[in-house]
């Protein structure tokens, strides 16, 4: 039963992003957590505070407006005090210049008592870098910005 509740909460979180409701996403993170995305692009890096994670989601929304996920699978294991979950997805979006884009990946979660303590987002980072480069060419300077990170 617990795993079904976690799957439902994760589906709801992705539905919120699909609907452009990002504010509730950050509220699900523990005050101290790990939010990371590998790569060398404006959405890469690692964050450990709610403030920096909120800035990251704001940047995501600006760079990839209309981002929508198609969740393919959700796998959940563990107990409430240490739950792991993986969400496999395909996404689609339209760049600010009107170009359609897409990617595929996995969100890897560690939850404790319903709060996100770790989220690592794995996707085709070269593909994402290509989209960021395209945005920079079209004058979107933020797409070429340094990653938002508070880890030194």
PLM features: residue spans?
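A short hydrophobic beta-strand element
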Residues: 81-91
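Short beta-strand edge/turn micro-motifs at domain boundaries
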Residues: 104-133
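Short, low-complexity N-terminal intrinsically disordered segments enriched in polar/charged residues
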Residues: 1-31, 138-152
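Hydrophobic pocket/interface hotspot
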Residues: 13, 25-26, 33, 49, ...
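Short, cysteine-centered beta-strand-loop-beta hairpins and adjacent loop/turn segments enriched
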Residues: 63-66, 92-102
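A solvent-exposed, acidic/Ser-Thr-rich amphipathic alpha-helical stretch
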Residues: 23, 28-83
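Hydrophobic/aromatic beta-strand elements that line small-molecule binding cavities or substrate pockets
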Residues: 71-76, 90-92, 104-110, 120
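Short beta-strand segments enriched in hydrophobic/aromatic residues
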Residues: 29-30, 89-93, 123
């Amino acid at each position: 039963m617990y795993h079904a509740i976690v799957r439902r909460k994760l589906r709801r979180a992705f539905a919120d992003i699909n609907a452009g409701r990002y504010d509730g996403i950050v509220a699900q993170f523990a005050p101290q957590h790990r939010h990371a995305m590998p790569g060398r692009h404006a959405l890469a890096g690692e964050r450990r505070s709610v403030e920096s994670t909120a800035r990251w989601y704001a940047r995501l929304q600006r760079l990839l407006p209309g981002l929508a996920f198609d969740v393919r699978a959700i796998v959940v294991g563990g107990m409430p005090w240490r739950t792991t979950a993986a969400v496999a997805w395909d996404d689609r979006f339209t760049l600010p210049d009107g170009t359609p884009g897409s990617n595929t990946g996995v969100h890897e979660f560690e939850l404790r008592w319903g709060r996100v303590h770790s989220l690592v987002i794995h996707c085709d980072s070269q593909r994402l870098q290509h989209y960021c480069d395209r945005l920079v060419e079209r004058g979107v300077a933020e797409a070429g910005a340094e990653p938002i990170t508070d880890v030194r």
